[in-house]
Amino acid sequence: MKVLHVCSELYPLLKTGGLADVMGALPFAQNEIGIDARLVLPAYPAISRGIPNTVVVAEFNNFAGHVVLRYGEYNGIGVYLIDAPHLYAREGNPYHDMWYNDYTDNYKRFALLAWVGAELATGLDFWWRAEIVHAHDWHAGLTAAYLHHKGRPAKSVFTIHNLAYQGRFLPYHLTEIGLPWWMFNVDGLELYGEMSYLKAGLYYSDISTAVSPTYAKEITTPEFAYGLQGLLQTLKAQGRLVGILNGVDEKIWHPYSDPYIEDHYKLKSMQGKRKNKIKLQAYFNLPQNPNALLFVMVTRLTEQKGVDLLIGSAERIVQQGGQLAILGSGSAHLEAGINWLAQEYPENIAVKIGYDEALSHLMIAGGDVILVPSRFEPCGLTQLYGLKYGTLPLVRSTGGLADTVIDSSSENIKARHATGFVFNDADVGGLCYGIDSAFTLWRKPSQWESVIVNAMEQDFSWQTSAKGYQSLYDILLHK
C-alpha cells in the first residue's frame, strides 16, 4: 500500500503547531506496520537543510513557474521536496512574514504543493506512484480538487487538524492555479464568495478525518463549523467523516527516555519527577517547595486556548498556595495579561514569552497539573504528554480533550478510571471549578497517586492511530 502525505510542516525540521508533530510521527508509525508511506513538502530552507542529500525526480514548468522535484530520505522515510525558490526560499514562518502578514502569493504556493501531491499519483515519479493521497489541513486542501480534475487516479483522504484555518482567497486566482472556473461553485471550492482550500479538501476527498471522534461530531454544529456545517453534516450522513485520535511520539515524549530532561523516571520509580519539579521551580525563580501544587501551561497565547480564562482565574491558584508557570507567545494583550500576573504574584506565577522545546519538556516532566482550558481543541497533544508524564491534565470538555481525559470524580477514582480534571463551561467559573478540584485531590496524596497511575497507564501511541488509518485506507482501496 503506497500512501503519500501532502503537508507543509515536519517536526523537528519546521514546526508552527501540532501539525508538525503529527507529520513527524504518523508516517513513521505507518511504515512500521507495513505501509509504504512518503511525504511531499515545500523545500523551505529549514526542510532543505534537514534533508540535504536529494536527487532530482522531475523538472517542469507550470502555473507556478519553474519547479524541480527532489527526493531524499529523512530517518528512513521517503520525502519529496518541491524546490521552487521564488515561492519557498523564505526563512522563518512558512505562512507569513516577520510582521505577521500572510504572504500574498500563498494561494499559489499551496496550490503548487497540492498539484504536485496529485501528480505523484499519476506518474510524476516514474518509480513510485501513490495509491492513497492523504492531504493535511488547508495548505494541502486543493490536492483532492486536482485529483478530481484528473479523473481520480488515486483515492484521497483529507485530515482536518483545525477547521478554523480555511485557506480563503479571492476567486480570480482560480485562473492562476490550473483549475477550471466551473469548480468555483457551492458544490466545489466556493465558500461565501471566496475560494476555500479547506473546503476543497472536504468536498472532493473520498473521505475526511478529524483528529478526534468528539471533534468530528462537534464540527457538524454551527458553533464549531465556521460556516461549513451543511457540508460536514452531509459528509457525516454519507459516512465520509470520521474521527481518529492523534498519538504520542514515544521516541520524543517518554519520561524514561526523554532526550531533553536529565532526571528520567517511570511509573514504579518517580524520584526523577520530583527532581524535575525542583529544577522547574528554580528555572522560573519560584520557591522550591515540593508541597506547592505546580500548574504548568505550554501553549499559543490565544483565546482559543483559553488563556483569557486562566488570566481571570489565576488568583484562585495563588489563594490556595499553588504555583503557575507559563510558556508561550501569541496575542499581545494576552502576553501583557500574563506578564502582569507574574509581576503581581512573583512568588506564585512565572512566565516565559516565546517557545523553548527543551523547557517545554521540563515543564511537562516537572509540573503537577498541565492546563489545557481550550474553547475548542481538535485533538490536543499537551494533555497526552501530561498523561504520559504523570502530570495530570486539567481540561475543558471539548474535542480530543473530552476523548482522552477522564475527570477525577469520586466515582471515577473509586473505579480507577480517573486520569485528570474536566470542566464544562468555557468561562472563568468553569476553570476555577477545575482548579479547586485539583487542589482537593492534591490534599489526598494516596488518591492523587492512584490517578497518576491511571494516567501513565493510558495508551495513546501512534501505533494505535496508524492502525486506524490503515483500516480506513483498506476500505477505500476495496471500494
UniProtKB/Swiss-Prot annotation:
GO terms for cellular component: cytosol. ADP-alpha-D-glucose binds at K15. The keyword Glycosyltransferase applies. One of its GO terms (biological process) is glycogen biosynthetic process. Keywords: Glycogen biosynthesis, Glycosyltransferase, Transferase. Pathway: Glycan biosynthesis; glycogen biosynthesis. It catalyses: [(1->4)-alpha-D-glucosyl](n) + ADP-alpha-D-glucose = [(1->4)-alpha-D-glucosyl](n+1) + ADP + H(+). It holds the Pfam family Glycos_transf_1. One of its GO terms (molecular function) is alpha-1,4-glucan glucosyltransferase (ADP-glucose donor) activity. Its EC number is 2.4.1.21. Synthesizes alpha-1,4-glucan chains using ADP-glucose. PANTHER family: ALPHA AMYLASE DOMAIN-CONTAINING PROTEIN, GRANULE-BOUND STARCH SYNTHASE 1, CHLOROPLASTIC/AMYLOPLASTIC. Belongs to the glycosyltransferase 1 family. Bacterial/plant glycogen synthase subfamily. This is Glycogen synthase. It comes from Histophilus somni (strain 129Pt) (Haemophilus somnus).
